[in-house]
Amino acid sequence: DKDSYKVSGGLHGVGVSCVNALSTDMKVTVYSHGKVHQQEYKKGIPQYDVKEIGESDLHGTKVQFLPDDTIFTSSEYKYETIANRLRELSFLNKGIRITLQDHRQVDAEGKSEIEMFHSEGGLREFVDYLDSTREKLIPTPLYMESDKGPIPVEVAMLYNTSYSENVFSYVNNINTIEGGTHVAGFRRALTRTLKSYADKSGMLEKLKMEVTGDDFREGLTAVISVKVQEPQFEGQTKTKLGNSDVMGAVDQVVGEMLNTYLEENPKEAKIIVQKVILAAQARNAARKAREMVQRKNVLSGSGLPGKLADCSESDPEKCELYLVEGDSAGGSAKQGRDRKYHAILPLRGKILNVEKAQEHRIYENDEIKNMITALGVSFGTEEGEKVLNLTKLRYHKVIIMTDADIDGSHIRTLILTFFFRYMRALIDGGHVYIAQPPLYLVKRGKEEKYCWTEEQREAAVKELAKDGKEDSVGIQRY
């Protein structure tokens, strides 16, 4: 409805209708043109016609609703999820103030928890927030904004010393996690402009390899926000933008403003190009390391790691690989497994933190090489040399089974980080699982109960102490 909103995130026009249909009660109050109007609904049915209930200088709409617990199995709101989204919106719409009040959390004085979200710097502050734990290569984010054309474009970007790319894109405040034409336009302009500057400066003359788009984006954190009157999304979930005209708009804005920045800031420009050169050299070394891992697998026959206790089943859909901590856990896991379907791969100590390592170092790490070899995956498809190839995946379930302590949690995080950065297709394909080890074994005689929480432990003790003698119940903590 262009008469109501210049741009909107709505796609089908059913947002409030769906909320109404899924609520036991809903009340909508509209403040407009000095008047206040209201309507209430129960189970989606209006209780009365829209009525005027007073006058006010306020502008906006207030929606109050209660989820229908006959439809939802759980209607508990996660504070962190809501807070993260409101923080995001405050960065995307600089200057606005958003208040989040949680009446479930009350302090000693009986006051509920209140958090205010406000950003004067907008996307600049957003990038600083995203990179707060990383070491910056240049002091302040590059900022680009243009609303001259039909598509307003806003971009902030910053280079850091990490080896990964973090690009977040938004269309009308919607997070397009799969990217789309606005991201394609940004990448095209970034690669073209930086390469042109690097060529003119002569810094690439001694480099004996071709520089690719990936090299220009290593260590980059960027936020792209566009406003589009008629957004066209691929699929129902609004995760990928399809408007072809957005690519050109973003390309032009980023190209012009980045070129100006590089010309006016030669010191920072040199630092960025040096980072690109290092990325190209590391990429070449990583390609050789990947090829070496895959060549060794071919030359050594099956090439399976020596510590892998494989399963006898040959159908990958029925096979499961358990990644466990060390040889001792591997021994216990082997005793409890079903040899037909369960394979066990013990990992020695903590694997490499791939977030802080150059790519070629990753493929030289023994534990990571063992995981790649055991899984049977390779790198390189028609989409690119770094894309994970799952055609020979040996297990359709990969279970990370670490201890229930801090070390176990750390090892699990390191493995998940490696999968997320270099084997994302495993996660997206639903192949990665996390085992939930119990914290306690509650035992009396031959009766045993495993417990995952304190509440379960207390309930198990009461259940097993039938005669009231809790001291006769043994508790083993893992």
UniProtKB/Swiss-Prot annotation:
<feature type="binding site">
    <location>
        <position position="325"/>
    </location>
    <ligand>
        <name>Mg(2+) 1</name>
    </ligand>
</feature>
<dbReference type="InterPro" id="IPR034160">
    <property type="entry name" value="TOPRIM_GyrB"/>
</dbReference>
<dbReference type="InterPro" id="IPR013760">
    <property type="entry name" value="Topo_IIA-like_dom_sf"/>
</dbReference>
<dbReference type="InterPro" id="IPR018522">
    <property type="entry name" value="TopoIIA_CS"/>
</dbReference>
<dbReference type="InterPro" id="IPR006171">
    <property type="entry name" value="TOPRIM_dom"/>
</dbReference>
<feature type="binding site">
    <location>
        <position position="403"/>
    </location>
    <ligand>
        <name>Mg(2+) 2</name>
    </ligand>
</feature>
<keyword id="KW-0479">Metal-binding</keyword>
<feature type="binding site">
    <location>
        <position position="405"/>
    </location>
    <ligand>
        <name>Mg(2+) 2</name>
    </ligand>
</feature>
<dbReference type="InterPro" id="IPR000565">
    <property type="entry name" value="Topo_IIA_B"/>
</dbReference>
<dbReference type="InterPro" id="IPR013759">
    <property type="entry name" value="Topo_IIA_B_C"/>
</dbReference>
<feature type="domain" description="Toprim">
    <location>
        <begin position="319"/>
        <end position="438"/>
    </location>
</feature>
<dbReference type="InterPro" id="IPR020568">
    <property type="entry name" value="Ribosomal_Su5_D2-typ_SF"/>
</dbReference>
<keyword id="KW-0238">DNA-binding</keyword>
<dbReference type="Pfam" id="PF00204">
    <property type="entry name" value="DNA_gyraseB"/>
</dbReference>
<keyword id="KW-0460">Magnesium</keyword>
<keyword id="KW-0413">Isomerase</keyword>
<dbReference type="GO" id="GO:0046872">
    <property type="term" value="F:metal ion binding"/>
</dbReference>
<keyword id="KW-0547">Nucleotide-binding</keyword>
<feature type="site" description="Interaction with DNA">
    <location>
        <position position="353"/>
    </location>
</feature>
<keyword id="KW-0067">ATP-binding</keyword>
<comment type="subunit">
    <text>Heterotetramer, composed of two GyrA and two GyrB chains. In the heterotetramer, GyrA contains the active site tyrosine that forms a transient covalent intermediate with DNA, while GyrB binds cofactors and catalyzes ATP hydrolysis.</text>
</comment>
<dbReference type="Pfam" id="PF01751">
    <property type="entry name" value="Toprim"/>
</dbReference>
<feature type="site" description="Interaction with DNA">
    <location>
        <position position="350"/>
    </location>
</feature>
<keyword id="KW-0799">Topoisomerase</keyword>
<dbReference type="InterPro" id="IPR014721">
    <property type="entry name" value="Ribsml_uS5_D2-typ_fold_subgr"/>
</dbReference>
<comment type="function">
    <text>A type II topoisomerase that negatively supercoils closed circular double-stranded (ds) DNA in an ATP-dependent manner to modulate DNA topology and maintain chromosomes in an underwound state. Negative supercoiling favors strand separation, and DNA replication, transcription, recombination and repair, all of which involve strand separation. Also able to catalyze the interconversion of other topological isomers of dsDNA rings, including catenanes and knotted rings. Type II topoisomerases break and join 2 DNA strands simultaneously in an ATP-dependent manner.</text>
</comment>
<feature type="binding site">
    <location>
        <position position="403"/>
    </location>
    <ligand>
        <name>Mg(2+) 1</name>
    </ligand>
</feature>
<keyword id="KW-0963">Cytoplasm</keyword>
<comment type="similarity">
    <text>Belongs to the type II topoisomerase GyrB family.</text>
</comment>
<dbReference type="InterPro" id="IPR001241">
    <property type="entry name" value="Topo_IIA"/>
</dbReference>
<dbReference type="GO" id="GO:0006265">
    <property type="term" value="P:DNA topological change"/>
</dbReference>
<dbReference type="InterPro" id="IPR013506">
    <property type="entry name" value="Topo_IIA_bsu_dom2"/>
</dbReference>
<dbReference type="GO" id="GO:0005524">
    <property type="term" value="F:ATP binding"/>
</dbReference>
<dbReference type="GO" id="GO:0003677">
    <property type="term" value="F:DNA binding"/>
</dbReference>
<dbReference type="GO" id="GO:0003918">
    <property type="term" value="F:DNA topoisomerase type II (double strand cut, ATP-hydrolyzing) activity"/>
</dbReference>
<protein>
    <recommendedName>
        <fullName>DNA gyrase subunit B</fullName>
        <ecNumber>5.6.2.2</ecNumber>
    </recommendedName>
</protein>
<dbReference type="GO" id="GO:0005737">
    <property type="term" value="C:cytoplasm"/>
</dbReference>
<dbReference type="InterPro" id="IPR036890">
    <property type="entry name" value="HATPase_C_sf"/>
</dbReference>
